Amino acid sequence: SDVFMDYAGGKAVIEIVLNQVFETEKTCAGKYLYLDFLSPHEIYDKVVVIDAGHGGPDAGAVGRLYKEKDINLDVALRFGRMISEHYPDVQVIYTRKTDVLIPLAERGDIANRAKADLFISIHINSNKSSSPSGVSVYVMGVDKASKNMDVAMKENDVITYEEDYSTRYQGYKPGSTESLIMFSLMQYAYQTQSCLLADMVQKQFVGNTQMQ
């Protein structure tokens, strides 16, 4: 943790940088300001981290009018506001709220530091046709494993935009044989849980929209 102080134009600024995610409660008493840093779970029943995929120089899929990174961010912010409005006992934390590139490792770290109950990463599909309507769900499993693998490898290519990504990700290289083997071993993890959650989300999504 670090504390930075600055005074300019008659205003004092104190910046506190913490290595964990906290909620802050402020109390004033005379000339003193007291700050209490509390874990989100001390205030909320559940903590949800919403991750808007891509960002910054990584545009994701690019269409004639829109970039995936911008749609992801818009959906993430709308989704977060909806959760806050309907479920006040749930704390919403975003990996990004502006057009910036957040390293993949940092996205996971944010969720881990907050001890999140659920991590939701939002991405948008691309399609050559303008008429498709519906939902696609990708789950790492044994069926159509190679197609799932291609999606995972492509999404993780974003790390090439990061400085010193080879060291940060312990030698991981997008597209390499070693990385392919690693993903093959990892794709079975949480398969059942992923399928159940995806099924519930898809049914709710289709049931509350005009999509087929």
Question: What is the predicted role of each segment?
Answer:
Residues 1, 209-212:
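Short, intrinsically disordered, charge-balanced linker/junction segments flanking boundaries
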Residues 1-48, 67, 71-74, 85:
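Signal-peptide-cleaved, periplasmic/extracellular N-terminal interaction regions immediately downstream
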Residues 21, 88-89, 210:
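Residue-level recognition of short, structured coil/turn motifs
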Residues 39-178, 183, 187-199:
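Catalytic-core regions of hydrolytic enzymes
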Residues 200, 204-208:
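Generic non-transmembrane alpha-helical segments
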